[in-house]
Amino acid sequence: MANRLSLDDARHVLDAALDKAVEIGQPMNIAVVDDGGHLIAFARQDGAILGSIDIATGKARTSALMKLSTEDLGKAAAPQAPLYGIEVTNGGLVIFGGGIPLTDDGAVVGAIGVSAGSVEQDVSVAQAGVAALDGRG
């Protein structure tokens, strides 16, 4: 992968996430972005909530820019936590689960963002995409 997320890699991540969404029976919106948060691949499954399109891409963008999962960022952005209020910066960040960085040799090369199910379902589908890339190395 050479510390860069190719279209082929992004499709591999997307396909694994789509398979997981089918397995759990929840139509999803799934976005894969590069390390700058720019869209590489996207899919909206039949029946996925239309309002979740922006949320999926926002989760992926947030995770890539901040270099951590949106779930972890959410914990750090809770009231009284060190990053409280960060979600209003950078054009708006998403601070609940479903966005996870994609790494190559420890370097963040992009991220996946998933939305349309429960937060737990979104995280599970995103993790399937991450695992597919990790298994490719």
Regions found by a protein language model. Give the residues of each.
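Flexible, solvent-exposed loop/hinge segments and secondary-structure transition points
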Residues: 1-137
